[in-house]
């Protein structure tokens, strides 16, 4: 056992971790359909969330300040020592998001409803707040209760039960 072999084994294992059998994936393949509420959620998601959560993994792979209240955790700023990176955290993939609670880098939200409530009315104006969360000087992302409910229904279509229940993992 050497560090190189451990790295190679871990790399091979991680290459096996492919989640691509969710309802969303089946819709893309033409073997399933969204409900009307899921379709409405997808539309709302594309309009209000996809600037950060895009692509097949539903992440832009960047680091952003998403308007959480400031804590001692400087996020990426602790690594880069760049003040512009303070309180910026990795934009996560939303694949299997319904199974990955608690949410945010510090686990402060226990439900997707609370996450969407944060973006709708809880965004804090901090020095490094991402500009997407401060359009025209207004904080947050305007979301109706129906949009939030439908977005959550859409997000649930990103869950791949086959992957989650795979006995190999």
Stretch-by-stretch model annotation:
Residues 1-169:
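Periplasmic c-type cytochrome electron-transfer domains
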């Amino acid at each position: 056992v050497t560090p190189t072999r451990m790295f190679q084994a871990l790399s091979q294992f991680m290459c096996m971790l492919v989640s691509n059998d969710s309802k969303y994936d089946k819709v893309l393949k033409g073997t399933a359909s969204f409900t009307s509420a899921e379709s409405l959620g997808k539309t709302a998601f594309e309009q209000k969330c996809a600037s950060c959560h895009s692509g097949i993994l539903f992440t832009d792979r960047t680091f952003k300040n998403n308007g959480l209240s400031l804590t001692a955790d400087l996020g990426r700023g602790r690594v880069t020592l760049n003040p512009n990176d303070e309180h910026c955290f990795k934009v996560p993939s939303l694949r299997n998001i319904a199974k990955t609670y608690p949410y945010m880098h510090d686990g402060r939200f226990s439900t997707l409803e609370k996450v969407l409530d944060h973006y709708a009315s809880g965004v804090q104006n901090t020095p490094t707040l991402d500009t997407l969360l401060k359009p025209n000087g207004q904080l947050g992302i305007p979301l109706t209760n129906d949009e939030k409910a439908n977005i959550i229904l859409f997000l649930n279509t990103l869950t791949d039960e086959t992957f989650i229940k795979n006995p190999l993992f």
